[in-house]
Structures are given as structure tokens and as C-alpha cells.
Design a protein with these regions (language model features):
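N-terminal auxiliary segments of SAM/dcSAM-dependent transferases
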Residues: 1-55
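Conserved Class I S-adenosyl-L-methionine
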Residues: 7-8, 225-278
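Conserved class I S-adenosyl-L-methionine
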Residues: 92-101
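Conserved SAM-binding loop of SAM-dependent methyltransferases across substrates and taxa
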Residues: 102-113
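Conserved SAM/SAH-binding beta-strand->alpha-helix loop
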Residues: 122-124
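A short acidic, Gly/Pro-enriched loop at the edge of an enzyme's catalytic core
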Residues: 149-160
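A short glycine-rich, Lys/Arg-flanked "PGG" loop and its adjoining helix->strand segment in the class I
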Residues: 170-182
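Conserved beta-strand signature within the Rossmann-like core of class I S-adenosyl-L-methionine
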Residues: 181-191
Length: 278
């Protein structure tokens, strides 16, 4: 598993030099100053710059989201991602999961491709992702703490980039994609989580169209996935709420409407947009 770090085209975030393994516990750069990066016991590596460290999801948020996703509510989303990757890329692909979080999607991608690389700015999320991969016996998924705005990987290193409910950084994705590579963006449709919003707000509203989708890549496919879920247990309801942007926009009075709510039926409405770098 550790050897995969040498196959991932990772570069030093400080001097941009190529990297190599020094034994099994350290990655070092081949630049003049030989910057070193320890590989954690969990199997991930921190390549975030000092200014970027400490950001992203908290440990408790990562734990709650992991438990929610492990219930299978979003399994159809993962299945659709794999379907589209296999249709527009191939099993020998190197795939970057930009904003990989706890690795729920990354590990499933890894089961179908040559190499999956997950980047996320939260060290708690990346640690959870690395532990998930170990737990599931996956040896072709590597995880790095790093910003998706400046990923520590060389130009044209990836056959595909997957962006799932994360900021869409077109210039950076264009840089790391090989010619002919694809970008797969999974984003909320108009009615996504409408049942949750109807519970929270007096006047529920449809989601706006996403404003940061690529303009310089060729759109080759767009598909819509819709289904309903019944979320059981208040902990799962609260975890779902915390995963959404509504969590940060909702007043305390409205948020209290979820207290003690042990069942929630809501819509899942996801748009999958596939772009190609020509």
C-alpha cells in the first residue's frame, strides 16, 4: 500500500520537486532541501502547507458523516459514479477524488480502477479515509491532507477527477487531468433534500443551479438520479443535516425542529455532469 505513494506523481508542496520513499515511514522530495513528510500509522500523508493546516471538517463531523454513509442511504450515488467512470474512463485509470472526505466514495472507486488518490484539507477526514481503506482491505487507494485548490500532484497525472459535493476548481482539475481525461461532478439537483427543508423551514425552496461548473471543458454527459430515503434515528437525521450547506444557514430556532426527530423522509436528487479535457 505504501509503495503506491511513489506511483502517484506526488510533488513536494513547498518546492514542487518530485517525491520518493525513504523506507516505509517517510516521503521525501528530491529537491535541494530534501523536505520530508511522515506517513502516519493510519497510512495517510500530510502534504498541506503550514497555512492550510487545521482546516476542513472536525473529528466529530467526520464521525457522524461516516456513520450516516455507512447506513447505505447514498449507495445509489456511489453506484452511479462507478457506472459513469467505467463508461467514460477505464479500469487502468488513476482517479483523483478531490475533496474525498472520509473516503466513502474513494474506496468504492478504488475497487474498480488501478489507483485512487483522495485529497482533503481535513486531517480527520483523511485519517478516517485511510482507516476505511485498511479496514476494507483496499491497497490501491492513497490519501493525502491537501487543498483541492493546489493539489500536490504533477500536471497531467490523472485519467479522471471526481468531485462529489465539493468546490469545483476547474483550473486545477484541468491542470492535473491528462489529455482526454474526464471530470465527473456530482451536485445537488433542484429537489435534493426537499423533505429535510420542508421540516426545517416554513417555506421550503428549490436549490439554485450550481454556479461554479466548468466552462472550458467539454460537457459530454449529464444524468439525473432521483430516489427517496427514509432516515431512521435522530443521530442520522442530525448527521445528514450537518452534511449540508443548510446547516450553516439555518437559524437556531429552525434547527431545533430536528431535535428528537427519529424519522425523516426526503428526496435525493443528484445531477452527474461529465466533462472531457480535449
Amino acid at each position: 500500500m505504501i509503495e503506491r505513494f511513489t506511483n502517484a506523481s506526488l510533488k513536494c508542496p513547498i518546492c514542487n520537486a518530485p517525491t520518493a520513499l525513504d523506507g516505509t515511514k517517510t516521503l521525501y522530495c528530491k529537491g535541494e532541501k530534501k523536505h520530508t513528510y511522515d506517513i502516519s500509522a493510519s497510512g495517510y500523508i500530510n502534504l498541506a502547507s503550514p497555512k492550510q493546516c487545521g482546516g476542513g471538517d472536525t473529528k466529530s463531523a467526520v464521525k457522524a458523516r461516516s456513520e450516516f454513509l455507512d447506513c447505505g442511504y447514498y449507495k445509489p450515488i456511489a453506484d452511479k459514479i462507478i457506472e459513469l467512470l467505467m463508461k467514460y474512463s477505464n479500469k487502468s485509470a488513476t482517479v483523483i477524488d478531490a475533496g474525498c472526505g472520509e473516503g466513502y466514495y474513494t474506496t468504492q472507486i478504488a475497487k474498480n480502477v488501478e489507483l485512487a488518490i483522495g485529497f482533503d484539507i481535513s486531517k480527520f477526514a483523511v485519517e478516517a479515509a485511510a482507516k476505511r481503506a485498511k479496514r476494507e482491505g483496499i491497497d490501491n487507494a492513497e490519501f493525502c491532507v491537501a487543498s483541492i485548490f493546489t493539489m500536490p500532484i504533477f500536471n497531467e497525472s490523472a485519467d479522471a477527477v471526481v468531485n462529489i459535493f465539493a468546490p469545483c476548481v476547474e483550473n486545477e482539475y484541468f491542470r492535473v487531468l491528462k489529455s482526454g481525461g474526464i471530470l465527473l461532478v456530482a451536485h445537488a439537483g433542484k429537489e435534493h433534500l426537499m423533505g429535510l427543508k420542508q421540516t426545517l423551514y416554513d417555506s421550503a425552496y428549490e436549490n439554485d443551479a450550481r454556479a461554479d461548473l466548468p466552462t472550458d471543458l467539454e460537457l459530454i454527459c449529464e444524468e439525473n438520479l432521483k430516489y427517496n430515503i427514509q432516515v431512521d434515528k435522530n443521530a442520522n437525521v442530525m448527521a445528514l443535516f450537518a452534511m449540508t450547506p443548510y446547516y450553516w444557514r439555518t437559524s437556531q430556532n429552525d434547527a431545533k425542529k430536528l431535535d428528537g426527530l427519529n424519522s425523516l423522509k426526503t428526496e435525493i436528487d443528484i445531477i452527474f455532469s461529465v466533462y472531457r479535457k480535449n
